[in-house]
């Protein structure tokens, strides 16, 4: 079963970010997930613009930048100028006056446009944007903090997205409380990738390479 694993870098050891990036890359991670929070759209702060730029310079692996900020269109150029073609930028539609304008700027910069869907956001409210984006990041927890519990009703949202993803040409990614059971349940059904945090990847005794290999060898 072919699925992507991306490391949630807000869960990494900030005291030695260089080593974390190096070890994750050597361990076989597919991409790095960067959570940017402004303390307004979500009640917390996470990684900084400098953290994002450093990781972009330290690896050739793709970055998935998740903008949990109000009105990202106002400052989207600051992020795009520090990323590489082929990196992904997710925005929250609720945080923007005209999200399609912001998504078009991401496309024009040569990056992959994505939207993040909160647990309380219905698919019907973002349907028009699904023809623009290439990736949909489904939040299985409310955004803003690591280590939250999975919200079971998100499963119905993923089922709806799986039914239309091929027709509308986007891929689905899972973010939040991602355990082995969720990968085993949803990867065979067509979820393309999973953001790994403290549940499966970080804070474990085993090296990253061993942990990632064990995840890839899950039996479906």
Describe each region flagged by the PLM.
Residues 20-34, 78-86, 126-139:
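Alpha/beta enzyme core
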Residues 17, 24, 35, 79, ...:
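Conserved, mostly hydrophobic/aromatic
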Residues 45-65, 108-114, 154-172, 214-220:
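Alpha-helix-loop-beta-strand connector modules within alpha/beta enzyme cores
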Residues 39-46, 119, 127-159, 166, ...:
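Glycine/Thr-rich beta-alpha phosphate-binding loop at enzyme active sites
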Residues 21, 71-82, 121-130, 178-194:
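Catalytic cores of alpha/beta
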Residues 38-105:
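N-terminal active-site wall of soluble small-molecule enzyme domains
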Residues 3-9, 32-34, 63-67, 87-91, ...:
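Hydrophobic faces of well-ordered beta-strands that scaffold small-molecule active sites
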Residues 89, 93-96, 137-147, 189-211:
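Glycine-rich phosphate-binding active-site loops on the catalytic face of alpha/beta enzymes
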């Amino acid at each position: 079963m072919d699925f992507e694993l991306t490391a949630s870098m807000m869960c990494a050891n900030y005291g030695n970010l260089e080593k974390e990036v190096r070890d994750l890359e050597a361990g076989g991670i597919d991409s790095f997930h960067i959570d940017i929070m402004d303390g307004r759209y979500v009640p917390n702060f996470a990684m900084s613009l400098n953290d994002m730029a450093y990781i972009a310079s330290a690896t050739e692996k793709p970055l998935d930048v998740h903008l949990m900020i109000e009105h990202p269109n106002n400052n989207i150029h600051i992020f795009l100028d520090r990323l590489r073609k082929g990196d992904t930028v997710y925005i929250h539609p609720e945080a923007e006056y005209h999200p399609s304008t912001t998504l078009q700027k991401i496309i024009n910069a040569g990056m992959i446009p994505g939207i993040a869907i909160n647990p309380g956001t219905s698919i019907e409210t973002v349907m028009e944007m699904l023809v623009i984006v290439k990736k949909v990041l489904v939040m299985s927890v409310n955004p803003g903090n690591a280590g939250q519990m999975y919200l079971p009703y998100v499963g119905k949202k993923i089922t709806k997205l799986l039914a239309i993803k091929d027709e509308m040409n986007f891929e689905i990614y899972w973010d939040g409380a991602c355990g082995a059971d969720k990968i085993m349940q949803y990867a065979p059904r067509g979820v393309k990738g999973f953001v790994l945090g403290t549940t499966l990847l970080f804070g474990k005794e085993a090296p990253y390479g061993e942990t990632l290999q064990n995840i890839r060898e899950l039996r479906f």
